[in-house]
């Protein structure tokens, strides 16, 4: 399977009165169709890593390749087009526009690409049916629950079939039931449609839906583990690594999935 994302020797230092090296020689790759989580303590560098992959920030050295192309070498106009075509984003706070309906929010990537209205409607109803939100398309964002808003945000992220989905704490504002619904949505898109996704999360339950978890500590790769057939076993393995990282995993060890 070809690599959809390659992270090669990424370094990032934030300069100030006291310089801080956020990332140190980070390297890993994600295959096409893989669902991977990144975990680590606060300040470990995981958000910096996601920002660099998404081109919000730039590395001091090293390379990012997405579908074989380094977006950091593109000029502004081509970079904007690359982001619209190749990347899909899912945020903790949904980032839906209150002035638009749920359906209009989902279609935004297609609107920016000036797709024909008939094509947009067809794609909208296809993804809405897949995610079980067809009955929400004419509602405003304040009329639906947090979990429904996040499923709409996921629909927006995948409607244009990007190469890579980047999710930043997608369940951070959700209760346990909505978290389960959202993670099952992402898992089914990965399994059925071979969507490639990288998710930053602090939540071991959410991470247990992934095929692989990469752990970062103090800006460096600390460990990585792969899921087998049993999600409960994988969840407990995640807790074990978090314990080594100094987290509060013991508080969650009795959770059964």
UniProtKB/Swiss-Prot annotation:
What's a GO cellular component annotated to this UniProt protein? Answer: plasma membrane
Q: What does this protein do?
A: Part of the ABC transporter complex YxdLM which could be involved in peptide resistance. Responsible for energy coupling to the transport system.
InterPro entries the UniProt entry points to: AAA+_ATPase, ABC_transporter-like_ATP-bd, ABC_transporter-like_CS, MacB-like_ATP-bd, P-loop_NTPase
> Could you tell me one molecular function GO term of this UniProt entry?
transmembrane transporter activity
Q: Does the keyword Hydrolase apply?
A: no
Record-stated family = Belongs to the ABC transporter superfamily.
The record's section on Pfam families has:
ABC_tran
**Induction entry:** Transcriptionally regulated by YxdJ. Induced by the antibacterial protein LL-37, probably via YxdJ.
Query: Which PANTHER family does the protein's record reference?
Result: ALPHA-D-RIBOSE 1-METHYLPHOSPHONATE 5-TRIPHOSPHATE SYNTHASE SUBUNIT PHNL (PTHR42798:SF7), LIPOPROTEIN-RELEASING SYSTEM ATP-BINDING PROTEIN LOLD (PTHR42798)
- Annotated protein name in UniProt: ABC transporter ATP-binding protein YxdL
| Occurrences of domain ABC transporter (ranges) | 5-243
- UniProt-annotated binding residues for ATP: 40-47
List the GO biological process terms. Answer: transmembrane transport
Oligomeric state and interaction partners are given as: The complex is composed of two ATP-binding proteins (YxdL) and two transmembrane proteins (YxdM).
The yes or no answer to whether the keyword Nucleotide-binding is present is: yes
Q: Which domain of life is it from?
A: Bacteria
Q: Which UniProt keywords apply?
A: ATP-binding, Nucleotide-binding, Transport
């Amino acid at each position: 399977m070809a690599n959809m994302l390659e992270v090669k020797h990424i370094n990032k230092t934030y300069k100030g009165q006291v310089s801080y090296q956020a990332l140190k020689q980070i390297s890993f790759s994600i295959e096409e169709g893989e669902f991977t989580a990144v975990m680590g303590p606060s300040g470990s560098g995981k958000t910096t890593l996601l920002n660099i992959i998404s081109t919000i920030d730039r590395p001091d050295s090293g390379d990012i390749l997405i579908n074989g192309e380094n977006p950091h070498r593109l000029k502004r106009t081509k970079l904007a087009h690359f982001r619209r075509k190749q990347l899909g984003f899912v945020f903790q706070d949904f980032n839906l526009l209150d002035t638009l309906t749920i359906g209009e929010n989902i279609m935004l990537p297609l609107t920016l690409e000036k797709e024909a209205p008939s094509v947009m409607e067809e794609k909208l109803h296809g993804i809405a049916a897949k995610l079980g939100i067809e009955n929400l398309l004419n509602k405003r964002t304040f009329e639906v629950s947090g979990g429904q808003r996040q499923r709409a945000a996921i629909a927006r992220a995948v409607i244009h079939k990007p190469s890579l989905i980047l999710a930043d704490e997608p369940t951070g504002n959700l209760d346990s039931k909505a978290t389960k619904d959202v993670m099952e949505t992402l898992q089914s898109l990965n399994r059925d449609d071979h969507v490639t996704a990288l998710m930053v999360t602090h939540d071991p339950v959410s991470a247990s839906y992934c095929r692989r978890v990469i752990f970062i500590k103090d800006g460096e790769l600390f460990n990585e583990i792969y899921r087998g057939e049993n999600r409960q076993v994988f969840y407990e393995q995640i807790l074990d690594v978090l314990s080594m990282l100094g987290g509060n995993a013991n508080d969650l060890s009795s959770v059964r999935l």
